[in-house]
Each structure stands twice: as C-alpha cells, then as structure tokens.
Amino acid sequence: MIQLIGIKSQCDIGIRQKFSITSEVLEGKLKYINELVGSVLILSTCNRTEIYVDSNLEEKKLIDTVFYGLDWDYDLVSYIFYIKDKYAIKHLMEVSCGFHSKILGEDQILGQIKTAYDAALEAKTIKGKLQRLFQKAITCGKEFKHICESYRIPVSIPSIVAKEILNMDIRKYMIIGFGKIGQLLFKYLNNSQAQIIYIAVRDLNKVHDSYKKCGKIRFISFKDRKSYYNDIDCIVSCTSAPDKIISKGDLPCRKLTIFDLAVPEDIDRNVLDLDNVTLYDIDNISVIDEKNKAIRKKTMGKYRYILENHIDKFIKWEKLHQLSPEIQKVKKYGDEICEKRITTFKNKKHTKDNDILVKTMIESTARFYINRAIEVMKEEKLNGREEECLRLINKIFCK
C-alpha cells in the first residue's frame, strides 16, 4: 500500500528545518527505514520533507516507526500529515507538476524528485509499485512542463532572488555554496551589471574552468569568506551545511542584504539584532512572488488534465498489478499442460505418423481447457452463478 508522511505546507521554516534530511545522511536513513517498513523514498528539499513508502503497516505504527528511524522529535508529530493510496498518488503527481511548491509552478521540484528517485535506486530501497509510481510522476512532470510551457515564466526561488537583487541595484555580492541553487543564481546574475561576484566554495579544485573565465566572477575559499564581507553589499547563502555559517559577530558595520536559501538555515537569526542587516529567508522570498502567482495558477489549471490522466493510468496499472500472482499461476499451469504433451510427442514421434500425432496433441490441449470450462459452468449453474460464469467463458472462448 502506497503511504505518505509529510510536513504540513503551512509550517514555517523554523519547523521545517527540524524535519530536514541532509544529503550526507540520506542513504543511511533510506536503508534504515527500508529495513523497518519496506520500499521507501525520501523527498527532502528546502520546502518539504516527504517519506513515501509501500508498506502494509497501519498508520500509527508507520508514523511511530518513521519518527524513530529518522530520529525526529515526537512532540512535533502534529506538524505532519498522513495520506495513502489514491490520495498519496494524487499528491505526488501534483508535486511533480509544481502545484504544491511555495513558488507555484516552479520546475526545480521535478529535478529534486528525480534526484530523490536516483538516491533511492542507489540505496536499493525502492522497487515494484513505489518505483513504478515515481517513474510515472517524473514522466507526468516532464509532460506537464512541456505542454504548459511553464518555463516561459521563471518561477524558481533563485530566479526571484536574482530579480530582487537586480531591482535593488546591488552590484557587489557573494554567493556562498555552489550546488544547483548557487549555479542557477550564477546563471541569472552573470549577465547583470554586477561589479564583482564572489562565490565561496569548500574546494576550489572542483570548480570547472569554464566558470573561471568570467571576469567579474571570483571564486574564493569557504574558510576565507569573512575577509570579503567588507567588500560586498549582499550575501546569498545556499549551502547544505548542518549548522549556521553566519552569525551577527561575523558581519561588518555596513549595510548588508542577506538571502538565506538553505534548509536548515545558514544564517543565525541573531543577525536581525543588527540595524544594518536585512534578512530574507525562504518564506519571505515566497511572498515576493505573489504578483505572478495568479497568472500561473490560471495557466496550470488549464492543463490539470495531464496529471489526471497519469493518475488514472497508474491506478489502472496498480489494479492489474494485483492480478500478477494469479496470472503467473495460470501461466505456470499452462506451461505444465504443454510440457506434458511435448514429452508425449517426443516419446512417440518415431513410432507414429507425426501429422496425426501433432493433430492429436493439439486437440488434446484444446479439449483439456474446454472440458475444464464445461466443468466450471456446471458447478456454477448448481451454485446459481451461471450468468456471470457464462459471460466470462464466452468472452474467453468465443469471438
């Protein structure tokens, strides 16, 4: 049974980060939960943490097990939601199309789902029905993005931050962290009127040479970042660090705008004690986007039929998949019938006319199933179920 435990969307970032799972511990958590409940995938982004499982555990037992396995504080259980079956399937399809993103319609989530799927594959914690569901969700998200053409309206958090930086006419800034979000920021800001863009990374040797060719870009060591704070007007922090990397004692006495795009947060809230610092977190940034939200909502609603089609297809597949054991049993039985007749043919092919022997074997196989069908018809007639039985037998044997 497909089940989902997730964090309620209205939770603020302070609560969300208590449930976040960093990439460094993801594989270990996947394997541990897999041992406890069965097939599992963990989707953990800056805006959501969702645990998808295919398990027969009942709701409370599953929630207790997941909280224990992920070392979550059970006092926070009121902040989670639980859904299963078609509701969990529908939720995932909506997530893949951007319907549940804080920035409505942003397409980063599709890449994040693919990353989560790859991580579960790598950890060998996903198979069967859950694997098929995520394959379907990724296909659904791609189709929705292509047909809806949501890419024509930049809606990712990095694009909104870049737009705000440009609107503020900030010319000197630092990006801390150069993962996917940092690289997107670089993409949006590289062609701006910036004077200097410092990019702080932990390993300078991993920076591709193509990035170093941009004149106004300067890559610096993460450990040296503080020595450059006096030279900039803005910091965008987007690392995957488990602890805070900036506190008020690190900052100079100059006007600074800081965007914290990390979950868990990179910036200690004590920086708000400084009159010269303006801090934006993920929740603040989401509010900035309200102007275009109505336009995207209308456009996305027009193409909702795409995800409805994918939901229907998966539910139909799921129902048919439940027949797999019976189908295999019928096939095995058929193979046994054929094998007996093949053995008979091999034993007699040198002693009898082969044409007559083949005809006899084929007729014998047909009679076997016809006689069995007749027996079932008689049994069901006596049990008062002949009408449905006759309908099925006619559908199988008669054109």
Curated annotation (Swiss-Prot):
UniProt-recorded Gene Ontology molecular function terms: glutamyl-tRNA reductase activity; NADP binding
User: Which EC class is this protein assigned?
Assistant: oxidoreductase
Family matches, as InterPro entries: 4pyrrol_synth_GluRdtase, 4pyrrol_synth_GluRdtase_dimer, 4pyrrol_synth_GluRdtase_N, GluRdtase_CS, GluRdtase_N_sf, NAD(P)-bd_dom_sf, Shikm_DH/Glu-tRNA_Rdtase
Q: Which residues make up the binding site for substrate?
A: 45-48, 101, 106-108, 112
Q: Which UniProt keywords apply?
A: NADP, Oxidoreductase, Porphyrin biosynthesis
The superkingdom of the source organism is: Bacteria
Q: What is its EC number?
A: 1.2.1.70
Which cysteine pairs are joined by S-S bonds?
none
What catalytic reaction does the record list? (S)-4-amino-5-oxopentanoate + tRNA(Glu) + NADP(+) = L-glutamyl-tRNA(Glu) + NADPH + H(+)
So, what pathway does this thing act in? Porphyrin-containing compound metabolism; protoporphyrin-IX biosynthesis; 5-aminolevulinate from L-glutamyl-tRNA(Glu): step 1/2
Q: Which residues bind NADP(+)?
A: 177-182
Which terms does the UniProt entry file under GO BP?
protoporphyrinogen IX biosynthetic process from glutamate
Record has ATP-binding as a keyword: no
* Signal peptide (from-to): none
Assembly state and interactors?
Homodimer.
* Cross-referenced PANTHER family: GLUTAMYL-TRNA REDUCTASE (PTHR43013:SF1)
**HAMAP family cross-referenced by the UniProt entry:** Glu_tRNA_reductase (MF_00087)
Record function comment: Catalyzes the NADPH-dependent reduction of glutamyl-tRNA(Glu) to glutamate 1-semialdehyde (GSA).
The extra comment attached to this record reads:
During catalysis, the active site Cys acts as a nucleophile attacking the alpha-carbonyl group of tRNA-bound glutamate with the formation of a thioester intermediate between enzyme and glutamate, and the concomitant release of tRNA(Glu). The thioester intermediate is finally reduced by direct hydride transfer from NADPH, to form the product GSA.
Quoted from the entry, the domain comment is: Possesses an unusual extended V-shaped dimeric structure with each monomer consisting of three distinct domains arranged along a curved 'spinal' alpha-helix. The N-terminal catalytic domain specifically recognizes the glutamate moiety of the substrate. The second domain is the NADPH-binding domain, and the third C-terminal domain is responsible for dimerization.
What is this protein identified as?
Answer: Glutamyl-tRNA reductase
Please report the organism this UniProt entry assigns to the protein. Clostridium kluyveri (strain ATCC 8527 / DSM 555 / NBRC 12016 / NCIMB 10680 / K1)
